[in-house]
Regions:
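Conserved acidic E/D residue at the C-terminus of a beta-strand in Rossmann-like folds
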Residues: 33, 100, 124
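C-terminal hydrophobic helical "lid"/dimerization subdomain
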Residues: 84-88, 127-178
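Glycine-rich phosphate-binding loop at the start of an alpha helix
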Residues: 11, 15, 36, 80, ...
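Glycine-rich cofactor phosphate-binding loops and adjacent beta1-alpha1 units
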Residues: 1-4, 39-119
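Conserved SAM-binding loop
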Residues: 31, 75, 122
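A local structural motif
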Residues: 27, 69, 143-146
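Mid-domain Rossmann-like dinucleotide-binding core that forms the NAD(H)/NADP(H) cofactor-binding site
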Residues: 1-55
């Protein structure tokens, strides 16, 4: 409840991360995102969440946290620059969780990180929390409805894939009616 949490990336996984973080009621949640449609989505559906562009993120987090950086960082974007941004925005002794997948290996610039004493956690979904997640959705504690921004009949599944793959029309998730 006293933490500042930074989520880098507001795609489907980032928004689901946001929904789970909101259950813990941290003092402040900041979402870093460059896509204006995703920023608009966050502001519309989660007005208490702060949003910031990547190029302004480090300064914004430092100014808007109690300890000179985020207490917890979730790196969900997976862009070439977001791994570095994640640890740079973290305060000393913070936890940085890397959910994103990268196309290339990331470098730990240890001299630059010296003194931060960060804890890194990595990994995607291992399935061990699926039962609890489904229970929270069923109980209405996690509302995933807003994430479904488009619906297509099964006969138009190729159109749905094209929309999602090309990130058109502010798509977050597509539901396919069977």
């Amino acid at each position: 409840e006293k933490d500042t949490v930074l989520i880098i990336g507001a795609g489907p996984t980032g928004i689901c991360t946001l929904l789970c973080v909101m259950l813990k009621k941290p003092k402040r949640i900041i979402v870093c995102e460059k896509d204006e449609n995703r920023v608009r989505f966050i502001k519309e559906h989660y007005p208490d969440v702060y949003t910031v562009l990547p190029e302004e993120c480090l300064e914004y987090v430092q100014k808007n946290s109690d300890h000179g950086g985020a207490d917890v960082v979730f790196e969900v974007a997976g862009a070439p620059s977001t791994f570095r941004l994640a640890w740079e925005c973290a305060r000393p002794n913070a936890i940085v969780t890397v959910v994103a997948l990268y196309d290339e290996a990331q470098t730990l610039p240890l001299p630059d990180m010296y003194g931060k004493n960060l804890t890194f956690k990595t990994g995607g979904v291992d399935g061990c929390d699926c039962e609890e997640t489904l229970r929270l959705i069923a109980e209405g504690k996690i509302d995933t409805e807003p994430l479904i921004t488009h619906t297509y009949p099964l006969s138009r599944i190729e159109d749905a894939y094209e929309l999602f793959e090309n990130k058109k029309d502010g798509v977050i998730k597509v539901a396919v009616e069977c």
